[in-house]
C-alpha cells in the first residue's frame, strides 16, 4: 500500500532537527535527492509549515515550494511590484484532525460559496454563485498515500472575511502522523546557540 511506501521513505530519509523560536524544525533529505522541511509548534505539536525542494531536470537544486503554512509577505521583493493586499489570499494550515485551507479577503455571505470534492480529478473545487471566485486545489498528503478523496470529509465555514475549508484526515494519515511525530521527538535536535565552544 502507498501509505506504507511513504512511511518507509520518511524513515529512510536523512533527518536533521533544530529547536528554535518555539518550533521543532526538521529537514529531510530523501534518497531520490528531493528535500522537505517541516516546522512543528513545540507546545501543540501541530504542523506549522512544510515546504519542498525537488531536483531540477539537470540535477541541480530547485526552488523551495510551500505546501503548508503562510507565505512571508515581506520578502526580498518588497520594493518591487506586488499584488494588492486586498486580493484573496489562499493558504493551507492544518490542525491535528483536519487539513485546512483559508482564503482571506473574501467577503461574500456563506450561501454564495460552493466547495466540492472531485474524486475523478482528485481535487477540490471552490466556486461562488456570483462567479467572482474559482479555485481548484489538490491534497498532496492524499496523493502521496494514494488515498481516495471523500466528499463527506469536506466542510466549510465563513468568518471575518475568511473562507475556512476543512477536510477530515483519514485514519491512515492520523496513524502515520502519530508515528512520525514519535520518531521526530526521539531525534536529538540542537537549539540555536548550542554550539560546542572549547574554553581556553
UniProtKB/Swiss-Prot annotation:
PANTHER family hit by this protein: PROTEIN DPCD
Entry's family note: Belongs to the DPCD family.
Protein name: Protein DPCD
Amino acid at each position: 500500500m502507498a501509505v506504507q511506501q511513504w512511511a518507509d521513505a520518511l524513515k529512510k530519509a536523512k533527518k536533521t532537527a533544530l529547536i528554535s523560536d518555539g518550533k521543532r524544525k526538521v529537514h529531510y533529505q530523501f534518497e531520490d535527492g528531493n528535500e522537505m522541511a517541516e516546522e512543528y509548534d513545540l507546545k501543540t505539536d501541530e504542523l506549522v509549515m512544510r515546504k519542498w525542494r525537488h531536483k531540477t531536470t539537470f540535477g541541480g537544486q530547485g526552488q523551495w515550494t510551500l505546501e503548508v503554512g503562510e507565505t512571508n509577505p515581506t520578502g526580498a521583493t518588497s520594493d518591487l511590484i506586488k499584488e494588492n493586499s486586498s486580493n484573496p489570499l489562499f493558504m493551507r494550515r492544518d490542525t491535528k484532525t483536519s487539513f485546512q485551507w483559508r482564503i482571506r479577503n473574501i467577503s461574500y455571505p456563506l450561501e454564495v460559496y460552493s466547495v466540492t470534492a472531485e474524486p475523478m480529478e482528485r481535487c477540490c473545487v471552490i466556486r461562488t454563485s456570483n462567479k467572482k471566485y474559482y479555485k481548484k486545489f489538490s491534497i498532496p498528503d492524499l496523493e502521496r498515500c494514494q488515498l481516495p478523496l471523500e466528499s463527506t470529509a469536506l466542510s466549510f465555514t465563513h468568518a471575518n472575511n475568511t473562507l475556512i475549508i476543512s477536510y477530515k484526515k483519514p485514519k491512515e494519515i492520523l496513524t502515520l502522523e502519530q508515528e512520525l511525530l514519535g520518531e521526530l521527538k526521539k531525534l536529538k535536535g540542537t537549539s540555536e546557540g548550542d554550539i560546542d565552544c572549547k574554553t581556553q
